[in-house]
């Protein structure tokens, strides 16, 4: 069959191929026609970079399909992938490679299917559609490879309009990961999402298992009012912390934000406003705490009551 290869200069090359040809074969044909070495070629189809060892039929490339040829920047780089067994894999990548591409390279080297791979960098699980540069992964960075437990689970997310979204997740997924999955499905930016479970707002850095969210649990999605506000928290040392909050945030949420900023565990925090100690389950609006209000933070004595 014939396929077309379009270059960034707008030139279109016609190739005679078979569905069983590998991407490597196709690059060799391009080299024969155009003189471009295969290791400088990147072929893109349907927005996806094609891996050498796969075939045209693997990517559902049919007659008269058009591939896009991008010249590989001579700024390819090496990164390392460390497995839980302690083995380190070296990969040749580019900043523009997607996480999906990286998983395909790992599959080529190690035989682990991409859907069983979870890649972690700087404590964050990497999402397939993002690129290495999105996560600021640079040359000689080390990613961590965790095998996905078979036993991923479904959860439901219910919106205020009554729509229910089904998500495939794992207990170890962070709330941040879940918001990214909702963005992929619904297009809602994570910073506009608030997720509620068992009456509690879920914090980005925590995992589903931290909140005991199990298979077929239902979370509630509330869109963040673009009326978030700033408040101040003053410590006994005189330091003032600025927090982004909403009137509907609970005192517990505020303590979690303080922990994220200052590292002080919530159970050691006492928050005072207008001479009154604030209770975890109440909200800022319950106490009439408004924008630019100042709370006072007192550290709870260990063993105090």
UniProtKB/Swiss-Prot annotation:
The record marks 68 as: Essential for function. It comes from the Eukaryota. Keywords: ADP-ribosylation, Cytoplasm, Isopeptide bond, Membrane, Mitochondrion, Mitochondrion outer membrane, Nucleus, Phosphoprotein, Repeat, Ubl conjugation. The modification ADP-ribosylglycine is found at residue 76. The keyword Transmembrane does not apply. One of its GO terms (cellular component) is nucleus. The modification Phosphoserine is found at residues 65, 141. There is a cross-link at residues 48, 82, 87, 103, 105, 124, 139 (Glycyl lysine isopeptide (Lys-Gly) (interchain with G-Cter in ubiquitin)). It holds the Pfam family ubiquitin. SMART domains: UBQ (SM00213). InterPro entries: Ubiquitin-like_dom, Ubiquitin-like_domsf, Ubiquitin_CS, Ubiquitin_dom, Ubiquitin_ubiquitin-like. The keyword Phosphoprotein applies. Residues 1-76, 77-152, 153-228, 229-304 form the Ubiquitin-like domain. Belongs to the ubiquitin family. PANTHER family: UBIQUITIN. This is Polyubiquitin-B.
């Amino acid at each position: 069959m014939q396929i077309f290869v379009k270059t960034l200069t707008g030139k279109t090359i016609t190739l005679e191929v078979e569905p069983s040809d590998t991407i490597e074969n196709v690059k060799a044909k391009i080299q024969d026609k155009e003189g471009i070495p295969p290791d400088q070629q990147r072929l893109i189809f349907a927005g996806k970079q094609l891996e050498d060892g796969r075939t045209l039929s693997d990517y559902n490339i049919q007659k008269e399909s058009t591939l896009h040829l991008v010249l590989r920047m001579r700024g390819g780089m090496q990164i390392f992938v460390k497995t839980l067994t302690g083995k380190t894999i070296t990969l040749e990548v580019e900043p523009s490679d997607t996480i999906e591409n990286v998983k395909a390279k790992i599959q080529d080297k190690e035989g682990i299917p991409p859907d069983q791979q979870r890649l972690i960098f700087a404590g964050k699980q990497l999402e397939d559609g993002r690129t290495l540069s999105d996560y600021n992964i640079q040359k000689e960075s080390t990613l961590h490879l965790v095998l996905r437990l078979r036993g991923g689970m479904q959860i439901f997310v219910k919106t205020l309009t009554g729509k229910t979204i089904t998500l495939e997740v794992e207990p170890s997924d962070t709330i941040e990961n879940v918001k990214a999955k909702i963005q992929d499905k619904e297009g809602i930016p994570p910073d506009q999402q608030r997720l509620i479970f068992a009456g509690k707002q879920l914090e980005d850095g925590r995992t589903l298992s931290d909140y005991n969210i199990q298979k077929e649990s239902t979370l509630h999605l509330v869109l963040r009012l673009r009326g978030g506000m700033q408040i101040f928290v003053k410590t006994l040392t005189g330091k003032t912390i600025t927090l982004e909050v909403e009137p509907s945030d609970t005192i517990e949420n505020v303590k979690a934000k303080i922990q994220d900023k200052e590292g002080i565990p919530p159970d050691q925090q006492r928050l005072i406003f207008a001479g009154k100690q604030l209770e975890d389950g109440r909200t800022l609006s319950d106490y009439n705490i408004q924008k630019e209000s100042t709370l006072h933070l007192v550290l709870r004595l260990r063993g105090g009551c």
